[in-house]
C-alpha cells in the first residue's frame, strides 16, 4: 500500500498476505480476528513480514492487532492498535522479531500474550495496568506536555508506546 485511504468496516482478517508493506496512506480497519496478518505461505518459501515505513494505520481487532508469522519492521508512520480483550491473543504478535526504528506505536490489548518490539532504536514504554473502555490515555513529559494521547474503545491491560519523541533518560507520566 503506497497511498490512498482504506476503510475496512468489518472483516475476518483486515489485511492478509505473506508480505504486507505499508508505505503511506490512511488505513482504518475493524476485524473480528487479526487486524494485519502476515501468514506463512509455504508455496512461496519466503518468511512472512509486515513492513511499515509511513502512513496512519488504526487496527481494531478482536484477535491479534498485528500478527506476523515472521517479522515486523516499523521505520515511520503512526500505528495505533486496539487489540484483543481475551488473553488468547495480543495487540502485537510476531514469531521472529519486531524492529522499531521510527514512527509512533500505540498498542493496547490484553496482557496474556503481550509482546513489545524486540529491537529498538528509539525508547519504548510498556505498562501493564487495567484501563476501562472509553478512557483517555495520555503520556506526558516532565513538563506536562502530551507526547501521546488516545481514547481506548475497549478494556485493555497491556499498553505499549514507542516514539522518537521519547528521549532517553527523561521522565514520563501516564494518565
Which ranges hold each PLM region?
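A composition-driven surface/loop motif
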Residues: 1-175
Amino acid at each position: 500500500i503506497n497511498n490512498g485511504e482504506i476503510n475496512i468496516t468489518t472483516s475476518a482478517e483486515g489485511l492478509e498476505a505473506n508480505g504486507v508493506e505499508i508505505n503511506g496512506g490512511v488505513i482504518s480497519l475493524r476485524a473480528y480476528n487479526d487486524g494485519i496478518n502476515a501468514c506463512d505461505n509455504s508455496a512461496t518459501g519466503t518468511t512472512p513480514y509486515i513492513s511499515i515505513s509511513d502512513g496512519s494505520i488504526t487496527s481494531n481487532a478482536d484477535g491479534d492487532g498485528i500478527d506476523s508469522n515472521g517479522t515486523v519492521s516499523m521505520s515511520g508512520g503512526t500505528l495505533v492498535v486496539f487489540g484483543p480483550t481475551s488473553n488468547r491473543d495480543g495487540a502485537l504478535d510476531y514469531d521472529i522479531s519486531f524492529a522499531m526504528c521510527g514512527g509512533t506505536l500505540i498498542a493496547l490489548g490484553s496482557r496474556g500474550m503481550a509482546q513489545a518490539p524486540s529491537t529498538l532504536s528509539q525508547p519504548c514504554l510498556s505498562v501493564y495496568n487495567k484501563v476501562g473502555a472509553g478512557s483517555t490515555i495520555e503520556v506526558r513529559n516532565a513538563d506536562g506536555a502530551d507526547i501521546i494521547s488516545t481514547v481506548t474503545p475497549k478494556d485493555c491491560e497491556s499498553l505499549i508506546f514507542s516514539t522518537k519523541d521519547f528521549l532517553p533518560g527523561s521522565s514520563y507520566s501516564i494518565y
